[in-house]
């Protein structure tokens, strides 16, 4: 993202990063042969943390550039917090997993709405 990129492009980048995080998290959950035991120091969890930090930095730049778009930023922050909390503990419980999934669903609905509000024909 730079100061000249159109808003729809910045939204698409944020959406891509958040979708990547979501799919990486799902893959991590599916690969767990230990049930609900988690290792926050594993290579995959460290990679998830790096991706979370990257998205948080990107979201901060987005917030500075589009300070009026608070709902999307709040939803991204909530999703990143829920993701970090889920994968930084040694045990994963159903309540935390459901909270993470719900915040992800809310975030991706926000992306759909933001995309509708910023179609390619209006933001060039």
From Swiss-Prot:
Q: Which InterPro entries match?
A: Biofilm_formation_reg_YbaJ
Domain of life, per the record? Bacteria
Q: Hey, which family's this protein in?
A: Belongs to the TomB family.
Q: What's this protein's name?
A: Hha toxicity modulator TomB
Give me the disulphide-bonded residues: none
What is the native source organism of this protein?
A: Escherichia coli (strain K12)
GO molecular-function terms, A-Z = DNA binding
Give Gene Ontology CC terms. Answer: cytoplasm
Q: What else is known?
A: Hha and TomB may form a type II toxin-antitoxin (TA) system.
List the top taxonomic levels of the source. Bacteria, Pseudomonadati, Pseudomonadota, Gammaproteobacteria, Enterobacterales
One GO process term, biological-process aspect: single-species biofilm formation
Where does the protein principally reside? cytoplasm
């Amino acid at each position: 993202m730079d100061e000249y990129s159109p808003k729809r492009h910045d939204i698409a980048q944020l959406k891509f990063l958040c979708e990547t995080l979501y799919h990486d998290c799902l893959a991590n959950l599916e690969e767990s042969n230990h049930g609900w035991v988690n290792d926050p120091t594993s290579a995959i969890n460290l990679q998830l943390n790096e991706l979370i930090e990257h998205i948080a930095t990107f979201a901060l730049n987005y917030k500075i550039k589009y300070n009026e778009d608070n709902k999307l930023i709040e939803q991204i922050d909530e999703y990143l917090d829920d993701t970090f909390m889920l994968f930084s503990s040694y045990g994963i419980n159903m309540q935390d997993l459901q909270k993470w999934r719900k915040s992800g669903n809310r975030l991706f609905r926000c992306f759909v709405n933001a995309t509708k509000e910023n179609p390619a024909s209006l933001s060039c």
